[in-house]
Amino acid sequence: MSLSLGAAIYIALKPIFKIYTIMLVGYLVAKFDIVSMENAKGISNMVVNAILPCLTFNKIVSNISWRDIKEIGVIILSAFILFVLGATGALFTTFATTVPKKFFWGLIFAGFFPNISDLPIAYIQSMGNGSIFTAEEADKGVAYSCIFLFIQSFLMMNFGMWRVVGLDFRDTKEPDSENITPSVSPAIDDRKLTEITKLPNITRPTNAYQSEDARSNSDLSCNSITTNEMTPQAFYEGFTGYIKPYKESNGASHKFESDLPHAEIYRVSSTYSSPGALEFSRIDGSSLSYSRISKNSDGRSYRRKRKADMNELISKYSAAEKIRQGELDLSRPLSLTEEVGSRNASIGNVHTGYTDESSIEEENCTNMATDGRGSLSFFIERHNLKWLQYFIINCLRPASLGAILGIICALIPWVKACFVTTYVHVHKAPDGEPVLNFLMDFTEYIGNACVPLGLLLLGGTLARLEIKSLPPGFIKSALLMTCFRLIVIPIIGVLWVNKLYSIDWLDTGIGKFDMILTWSMPSATAQVYFTAFYTPACGDHIQMNCLSVLFVMQYAILFITVAFVVTYTLKVDLKV
């Protein structure tokens, strides 16, 4: 079968149109606050910890066998070359252009790790309609992409390379937290009333009829807390649990939590049910704007939802205050069930980071039962094996575990035969299928949701990026890095893959296509969350601004570069 040039271009563009349309839906969903940042974070955790492991396990077990060991080795080698080549391009960019000192390591990270998860998988799945590749070949290509993704995840999480982003924040000066947050404890004393009365710059909320521009300029600053007119006596009615409500002439009641984290800011806003009632809502970042208050024709007030912005993203992911206060130890693994953990994980009784009174009591009650694990902890400390502990704990991440189990099951013939039909004879279930085939049905059913949800989240992430200010000359840096990432590296990738094919290290067309496509991807969007993790709530957010410019440039021309590379691959390399 021979395709015309126009047909090849259309086939190359069609998957891109689908991908960009899904991303557009995610963009609009985030912009109109249909899915809040909190909900998006929950969905992201679900994808990473439940859906992605199912997809990885299913595709690897179904399409990889011991006969593919050579291809797996080639993929691993090619992945390391791709990562090193991207980092080299980032280093060249730092020497050739003016890159801010506070974004040096961020640019290195952006060059090192490409987006080899949702985008290439979605593209390859779209090509499996029989015109170029069969459905079986497309599934095998997805399995190859899952191995690429596993290698990147292994380096990023198991070896802790995600912490490279934090090197840009070493010189960040944290604002004095005493000037921005009140510290309230359950103890009843007059000192708490004095602290509350000294809150700086208490201002009234913005007028209900003010313009959008005026409202955007009334964001909370790092040294102010927005509240309604409330007397200090309203707070000082008791400091156990919630502050006891008091009654004004209009019958409004107020409540306040006494158990306030040190680094959090609280605001007062009108509730939906009663315009007179006030409630405190917690804000993790102090630069979030107040929800706009309007009135309808009946005179009832209501609040309009805030537009999605970068401050909201930072407020949900930032752990800068916890790191500064020592509540989070980055030399130890973070939570295994979050994409970007907000607390430390632990092994045995090696507690990491923050511990509260209940955890201390629990530890005291179980000391007798954990002597062995305590000895293990002592052994790890004595022989300086924390790096090994970090590596092993991160192997228990669902994303890593799904790939590891999938590779093990796929490379052992009689184990694989328990899941899918192979040449190895094993006893079948009554329906003629392998005994554990129901697990393949389960993982396939759940894994099918991975790519659409991932693309929706990608669009939502891009919607929350903002460019507020840029260092002089960084536009040239971002442009050069974009050209290197999306033009130079794909050209080198085509040459590399053709060399592998000529020496019989790659045997299949889908293997060539998947590898060339992987080398054509933009920077990993996971960097947005890692950067937000280190970003303080207050400040100029220079790292997020630079990262926003970089992603906007890359995704603005991605559809052109990928279409060109795929068209060339189809006509010249695959000769279709």
UniProtKB/Swiss-Prot annotation:
InterPro entries: Ecm3-like, Mem_transp_PIN-like. It comes from the Eukaryota. Keywords: Membrane, Transmembrane, Transmembrane helix, Transport. It is found in: Membrane. The chain crosses the membrane at residues 9-29, 46-66, 72-92, 104-124, 142-162, 401-421, 438-458, 477-497, 513-533, 546-566. GO terms for biological process: transmembrane transport. This is Uncharacterized transporter YLR152C. It comes from Saccharomyces cerevisiae (strain ATCC 204508 / S288c) (Baker's yeast). The lineage of its organism: Eukaryota, Fungi, Dikarya, Ascomycota, Saccharomycotina.
